[in-house]
Amino acid sequence: MLAGQALAFLGLTWGTFQSLAIPRITECGLSCSQGFACRSHRNRNIFNSFCRPRPVSMSRSVLEALTSSTAMQCVPSDGCAMLLRVRASITLHERLRGLEACAMSLDTQETQCQSVWVARASHRQQGGQQLQVHFGCFAVSVAQHLYVTLRTIPHFCGVQLDQRHLVEDCGEEDVGRSVPDCLAGKLSYWVDRRRKAILVQVPRASGSPDYYLRLCLKRFTCEDAGAPVRVTANSVSQAVFLPYSQELPCLCLEGWSATPDAVRIQICPFENDTEALEVLWDTVYYHPESQTLSWEPACPVSGHVSLCWRPGPGAGCRKLQQSSQLVHRRVQYPLVDTQPQLCLKFSTSWGSWVRCPFEQRRFPTWKMTIQPSPTKGHLRVTFFSSSPAHFQVHLCHRRKSQLPACQRTLQASPLPSASGDLAAAPAFAFLDLPREEACAPGICIQGWRTDVHFSVPQQLCNLRSSGCPSLRGRRRPRTRPRPPTAGWAWRALNRRLGGGNGETIRP
């Protein structure tokens, strides 16, 4: 008993394995159940697109079953062609004249239909009997998405069967080694960075159709990045040079056969190239008229972008509040301060990058200085700007690991330029601060521009050199007095004794 079950299981497994293989056929025509007379029409009857009321005597299940499968028809010199086989099972009815099967490509909306008519004597005399119909084959392509429908003739409302069918792709072993589209899709390429071109080698099977190659930018669709090149079947060389202007992660090589609804093969040579990724963050532009900073990536990018500022060289970039944006297409920041410390930070699935567009270019900028004020007991904060601007000052408590805690906000008073001509001399603004507050231990002064949406601060700390008194208890520098005898001999002897040249020595 166990042996019989094992044999039955093995037989079932082997039958299932064989059913996974794509059958090869030599002929594919119409056939009906024995005893029924059928004839076929390839042209679609447009009037069958409109339905009519179903007779009361006709059941909705008059269409019993619809099955679709893929087959291959092979010619030794030309390879194999992909075909779709459709089978239907119906119950005959006196009002039913025939069947219509259609296969529509979901990619191109192209539709193929076949009609099968049953002789009048058959549906009158054999009403209620089951009829099996094998339609003629539909020509399909590798990896094609199809929508298959079955209707009655005439088309009765609510009486229809449909299903989706996916044609096997080149990854299926039998298809990959037998179909010309798959053979031609095995492209070999070399990137010539010096000549900025991609050399493509197209392997050809005997009798295969012409082949197209192009470069495209893979966005929602693959957009042309150059004119397509046609490789003819009888061309002497199957090698093609495709020039490109810029290495980008979304720059792809696309190839397809010169046949309707052919499968397109895409290869993206720079997809994981570090240098190509760096190019994406360099398309930052500043528009002086509107003071707008914009960035538009050449390739689709998923992530966030924000403005940040660097307090000094090598420091981390601190994010500006309310500046984060999701990256969809183009990113814009209006009314941006053109300070060298202002940067853009890009955070994506590939990693993070920082670009400071004003760092190495000459843009309108401003500067803040602190010096003793003519008013007794005060320090004067002065702003110099190459264009009219408004500023404010913060008194901040300096911290070691965090941003300074800024409390007071003071507005600077603008002054016209000395000559009255802003183009000839910079504009000025100033603010006098009480010396006791500004010179307190751990206090920094931050200056901001207030007439723009996004600005970075300038910060000055340790203000003793700006008019604040020195700390009490600090020893004065000692100076070793220079001996009365001067000359190179005495200086050499003094150096050997460790005295130096009489310079100031800090404790």
Swiss-Prot record:
Its main location: secreted. It is found in: Secreted. GO terms for cellular component: extracellular region. GO terms for molecular function: interleukin-17 receptor activity. Keywords: Secreted, Signal. Pfam families: IL17_R_N (PF15037). This is Interleukin-17 receptor E-like protein. It comes from Homo sapiens (Human). The lineage of its organism: Eukaryota, Metazoa, Chordata, Craniata, Vertebrata.
